[in-house]
Amino acid sequence: MTSIKHLLINAKKYDQKEFEIKAWVASNRGNTNIRFVEINDGSTIKNLQVVIKKEIMSFLEVDKIRLGAAIHVKGVLKYTPGMAQEIELNADKFILLKNTDEDFPIQKKETSLEALREIPHLRHRTTTLRAIMLIRSTLALEIHKFYNERGYLWVSSPIITGNDGEGAGESFVVDDESKDFFFNKKATLGVTGQLHAEAYALGFSKVYTFAPTFRAENSNTTKHAAEFWMMEPEVAFFDLKDLIKMSDDMLRQVIKRTVEAHPHEFEFFEKNKPGLLKNLNLFLNNKLSILEYREAIKILEKVKDRFEDKNIFFGKDLATEHEKYLAEKHIQGPVAVINYPKSFKAFYMFQNEDNETVAAYDLLVPGIGEVIGGSKRETRYEKLVQRVKDLKINQEDLQWYLDLRRFGQASSAGFGLGFERLIMYITGTENIRDTIPFPRTPKNMKM
């Protein structure tokens, strides 16, 4: 059994050869002499047109086949370059394996993405969601490839944890409904795998985590979800410069290979969002620039009237509109903004000599703004302990992490990549709910 994608890639070579496919019906049309049934097996967004003649199957039976029905077809492939259908299959055998009921909600008439979110178990059978999920799968594979090729260890970070790595306190508590704690202490769903990755970098040198993370943040924006995936590499002996280069190399390779692997899908995305490929090429074809946070503030202050948020000052966390301006208008390419004020950054970031900023960066790209945030880690035990105290974080829960500084952690650096944010960026998807198979958001969990 072969796939439709494989047939498309090898169309010329397979002309006039016989193939057998099992798939689902995407459309059913024709006239009194011939029927055309388009099928899709999920390997690509492109459908395969099956040509059915009367002697193969009664047209009365063909007409009963509804969208979404499972079929089994055997026939001869015909290569038709220059036609609307690059290939078609002339059926010798066409079998209906399972029809759909009349109330099957996926029909030829386009359904809004908002309506499709009500049927997460079926929406991937539409062209849009199929395209996004194909890209999601390839992106994940390419991320693993990038780190595997460079000798990184993949660490399975825990889902259940006893500490809040971000210090934000927006965690889901794990409760077994008994009077006593199951783990003899308060347990939460992890908001990051970074702290555990740091422990493993101290011994394996180069590691990364790629796992679901959870935030109990009551935010109903297009960019937030309660459950999402994070990819977090951590490298011993790296400084900020090394980290920025590695993150830039990773993004370029992963995006380039994914786009190359899915020509039909990206043709579809570009049609839905003109200019998408231009923004991707702005990133791929331009060298990464480095910009000090202080300098970024000065640049933004000069053009503040163009922003909705005009209140720009040193110590402000940049909004998306500010980030997009820096990447799209000022730099016209990717830019890493470095050395942010420590006032709004995490406790574990290395404090610079000015005692006002930390060795942190955000990587901004045209079209979306921030895709990566990272830092060199604070490895001076006394400074880290003081920072924990200043932020009123429970030191007892983090003592194991603090102790890494006493047990050979000379230096370390790492970043976090919101996986769904990356999918949104390269597919032009505007709502994070459409990049996750089964999204979890406030007051909403369908399955």
Curated annotation (Swiss-Prot):
Record keywords: Transport included?
A: no
Pfam families xref list:
tRNA-synt_2 (PF00152), tRNA_anti-codon (PF01336)
One GO cellular component term of this record is: cytoplasm
GO MF terms here are: asparagine-tRNA ligase activity; ATP binding; nucleic acid binding
Recorded family membership:
Belongs to the class-II aminoacyl-tRNA synthetase family.
Q: What does the annotation say about its assembly with partners?
A: Homodimer.
Disulfide connectivity for this sequence is: none
Output this protein's name: Asparagine--tRNA ligase
The record's annotation in InterPro entries points to: Aa-tRNA-synt_II (IPR004364), aa-tRNA-synth_II (IPR006195), aa-tRNA-synth_II/BPL/LPL (IPR045864), Asn-tRNA-ligase (IPR004522), Asp/Asn-tRNA-synth_IIb (IPR002312), NA-bd_OB-fold (IPR012340), NA-bd_OB_tRNA (IPR004365)
**Gene (UniProt):** asnS
Major subcellular site: cytoplasm
Natural source organism: Mycoplasma mobile (strain ATCC 43663 / 163K / NCTC 11711)
Stored CDD domains: EcAsnRS_like_N
* TM regions (residue ranges): none
What the entry lists under NCBIfam families is as follows:
asnS (TIGR00457), PRK03932.1 (NF003037)
* A biological-process GO annotation: asparaginyl-tRNA aminoacylation
Q: Where in the cell is it found?
A: Cytoplasm
Name the EC number(s). Answer: 6.1.1.22
Catalytic activity entry: tRNA(Asn) + L-asparagine + ATP = L-asparaginyl-tRNA(Asn) + AMP + diphosphate + H(+)
Q: Which keywords, in A-to-Z order, does the entry hold?
A: Aminoacyl-tRNA synthetase, ATP-binding, Cytoplasm, Ligase, Nucleotide-binding, Protein biosynthesis
